[in-house]
């Protein structure tokens, strides 16, 4: 009865059942994190394809990990590499840690605000991220289930500075990306 009420209120089924599927993974999700999307699976495909047969092991970082879908997939599929993941919220990181454990992979999680990413001081070979990119003014075009239930800070960016997160990630990469990265 409650599930039907939630569906009628446009709550995504993934939040109602508390899980989502991403590649070969089953992930716990809640309204603190975005529901993993097929487009994000394509991002993981590109990284896996590019680094599947690369030696020696690489340090990979997922910036803004959310549910951990990217980091956990990379840890599972690129086993010999070291995967780091960061987000700025304890509850989000706890959920991502649960997902890593549930999927039997080792991911090194850090709590870090993206505005202070450079203070991480971690040399890496691969930077992966699916940062917010939808302009606030585009909210009117979004489906109600997204607007009502998914975390806006993981989707929307300030209209005046839409590339903020990309710039911060690029600044980090310029300082910390290994020459082979």
Language-model segments: what does each one mean?
Residues 34, 58, 83, 154-161:
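Acidic, proline/glycine-rich intrinsically disordered inter-domain spacer in sigma factors
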Residues 39-141:
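Conserved SAM/SAH cofactor-binding pocket of Class I
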Residues 74, 146, 169, 173:
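Class I S-adenosylmethionine-dependent transferase superfamily signal
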Residues 133-165:
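Mobile active-site "lid"/loop adjacent to the S-adenosyl-L-methionine
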Residues 1, 88, 161-165:
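Soluble or luminal CAZymes and related metallo-dependent hydrolases
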Residues 10, 124-125, 147:
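S-adenosylmethionine
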Residues 159-181:
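Conserved Class I SAM-dependent methyltransferase catalytic core
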Residues 1-50:
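Conserved AdoMet
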């Amino acid at each position: 009865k409650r599930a039907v009420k939630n569906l009628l209120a446009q709550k995504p089924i993934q939040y109602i059942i508390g899980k989502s599927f991403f590649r070969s993974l089953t992930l716990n999700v809640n309204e603190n994190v975005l529901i993993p999307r097929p487009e994000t699976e394509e991002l993981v495909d590109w990284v896996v394809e590019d680094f599947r047969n690369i030696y020696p092991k690489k340090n990979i970082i997922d910036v803004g990990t959310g549910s951990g879908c990217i980091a956990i997939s990379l840890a599972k599929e690129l086993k010999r590499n070291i995967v780091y993941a960061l987000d700025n919220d304890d509850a989000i990181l706890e959920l991502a840690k649960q997902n890593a454990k549930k999927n039997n992979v080792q991911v090194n999680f850090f709590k870090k605000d993206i505005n202070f990413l450079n203070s991480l001081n971690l040399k890496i070979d691969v930077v992966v991220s699916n940062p917010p990119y939808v302009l606030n003014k585009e909210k009117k075009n979004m489906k109600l289930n997204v607007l009502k239930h998914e975390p806006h800070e993981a989707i929307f960016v300030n209209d005046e500075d839409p590339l903020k997160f990309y710039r911060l990630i690029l600044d980090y990469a310029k300082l910390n990306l290994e020459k082979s990265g």
